[in-house]
Every structure is written in C-alpha cells, then in structure tokens.
Design a protein with these regions (language model features):
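Bacterial Sec-dependent N-terminal signal peptides
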Residues: 1-20
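Short, aromatic-enriched amphipathic alpha-helices that serve as compact interaction elements
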Residues: 17-32
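Solvent-exposed, acidic/flexible segments
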Residues: 29, 53-57
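Short, well-ordered alpha-helical segments enriched in acidic and aromatic residues
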Residues: 32-43
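Extracytoplasmic
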Residues: 39-41, 73, 89, 102-104, ...
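A short gly/proline-enriched turn/hairpin at secondary-structure junctions
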Residues: 46-53
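Surface-exposed, charged secondary-structure patches
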Residues: 62-101
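Short beta-strand edge/turn micro-motifs at domain boundaries
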Residues: 102-126
C-alpha cells in the first residue's frame, strides 16, 4: 500500500502542468508570432526597444510580427527555465539571434485554468 501511495504521488508530480517550452522555442526560432500567440494570456506585457506596455493578445501578436519582420530570427536557445515556489508560475530566459543582433528574451508564464500562458515577454538587445 505504501508503494502504491508513493507511486501515486510521484505520478501526480510528474503530470503537473508545465509551459510548452518546446513550442514557444520553435515559434521564436522561426519568428512565428501567430504560433507564439497560442500561448498568450488575454493581455500580455511586451517590452522591446520600441514598445513597453500591456497589450491585448491581438495587439501583442501584431507587435511581435512587426519585430520579426524587421529582425528576422535565425535561432533561439533557452539558457534557463524553472518554476516559482508556488508552482503557479514559470520563467524562461533565452537568447534570440535575429537580424544580425543577439537578444535576451525573458518570458514569464502564469497558470490560468490549468494551462501555462505567457503574461510577460521582454526582448532586450545583448
């Protein structure tokens, strides 16, 4: 019985919701704002060299499309990611190579109705 209880707790921990970092990473690598927007909350804070504010999902998608048009991505790699102590939020830090420049990307995810959605994205030139 103790083994069953341990296995159940282990399975519950393993199946806890996680942000889809593979899909987010692939969308950033391709510069695909539409694919990335699937993981946006209804409002998202976007910070780049030219914008800084809270935007609707549609506005944020448009702003990122403009960014990816002027700075065509050629690759993205995650350098760090993890969960907050409360397990209700996650972060991801990565490097985007785009338009001949290197950018540091910070993404903050928050759990909303059982799914992790992007609440904040910062794109800063390295």
């Amino acid at each position: 019985m103790k083994i069953f209880a341990f296995a159940f707790l282990l399975l519950a921990e393993i199946t806890t919701a996680q942000p889809n970092l593979n899909a987010v990473s692939a969308a950033l690598s391709k510069g695909d704002a539409t694919a990335l927007s699937q993981y946006f909350d209804t409002t998202i804070e976007i910070v780049t060299e030219t914008v800084d504010g809270s935007y609707s999902k549609a506005q944020a998608t448009h702003l990122l499309k403009e960014f990816f048009t002027t700075s065509k991505p050629s690759g993205f790699s995650i350098s760090s990611s993890g969960a907050a102590r409360d397990k209700g939020s996650h972060y991801c830090i990565g490097k985007l190579v785009a338009g001949g420049h290197n950018y540091r990307i910070n993404i903050f995810f928050k759990e909303v109705n059982g799914a992790f959605l992007i609440k904040e994205m910062r794109i800063e030139e390295d």
